[in-house]
A protein has these predicted regions:
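Interfacial segments of transmembrane alpha-helices in multi-pass membrane proteins
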Residues: 14-63, 129-133
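Hydrophobic alpha-helical interface/terminus motif in multipass membrane transporters
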Residues: 26-27, 54, 84, 88-91, ...
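Loop-to-transmembrane-helix entry motif
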Residues: 12-21, 33, 37, 105-116, ...
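Residue-level signature of catalytic and energy-coupling elements of molecular machines
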Residues: 9, 24, 41, 45, ...
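Single conserved hydrophobic/aromatic residue that forms the stacking wall/gate
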Residues: 1-7, 11
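Transmembrane alpha-helices and their membrane-interface boundaries in multi-pass membrane transporters
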Residues: 74, 78-86, 110-129, 137-170
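Hydrophobic transmembrane alpha-helices
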Residues: 27-31, 43-44, 56-57, 61-82, ...
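Helix-loop junctions and hydrophobic alpha-helical segments within the transmembrane domains
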Residues: 85, 91-115
Length: 170
């Protein structure tokens, strides 16, 4: 029936999302140390969930375009977290663990990371003003990209440093 087919689609999308997250995490573990990889990976669902909370407010639905937008922005979310996280770790290796070295690490990359994110937001923003059928179809793309990147900035400058500030394993 139509309902069971719809539930099957939801299950497939959920499974694909979990598999995608697992692959991102696995890749991060191969490239980074386990602690940093874990906190960088946790930034993805935090940024996505923060954005999803505002979907209804902006009239965004979960569909193929919104899923595509989430995939497009995934790499940017991970990239920002890796840049900030790696710089924090580098400062901690030089000055020792603690809030001072963590803050120094964040401050050093705050401007370039913010400028990079804002540039991406500005690049996607004109799609908001496209009219016609294409505008109706793709109008959600910039909203999602901007929302996710906004929450990503909050995550990499507030949540990620808080987790990496102490010298404990987790």
């Amino acid at each position: 029936s139509r309902v069971s087919r719809g539930l099957g689609d939801v299950y497939k999308r959920q499974r694909n999302g979990i598999l995608g997250f697992a692959l991102v995490f696995l890749f991060l573990v191969v490239m980074l140390d386990l602690r940093l990889a874990t906190w960088v990976a946790m930034g993805v669902p935090i940024s996505f969930m923060g954005a999803i909370l505002f979907f209804d407010f902006f009239g965004v639905n979960i569909n193929m375009v919104s899923l595509f937008a989430l995939i497009v922005v995934l790499g940017l979310v991970v990239d920002d977290a890796v840049v900030v996280g790696e710089n924090i770790i580098t400062e901690q290796q030089i000055y020792g663990p603690g809030y001072a070295s963590t803050l120094k690490g964040v401050r050093e990359v705050m401007s370039p990371v913010t400028i990079g994110v804002l540039t991406t937001m500005v690049a996607f923003a004109p799609i908001l003003f496209v009219t016609g059928e294409f505008g109706q179809i793709m109008g959600e793309l910039p909203i999602i990209v901007i929302l996710v990147l906004t929450f990503s900035l909050i995550e990499v400058f507030a949540i990620l440093p808080a987790h990496l500030a102490h010298g404990k394993p987790w």
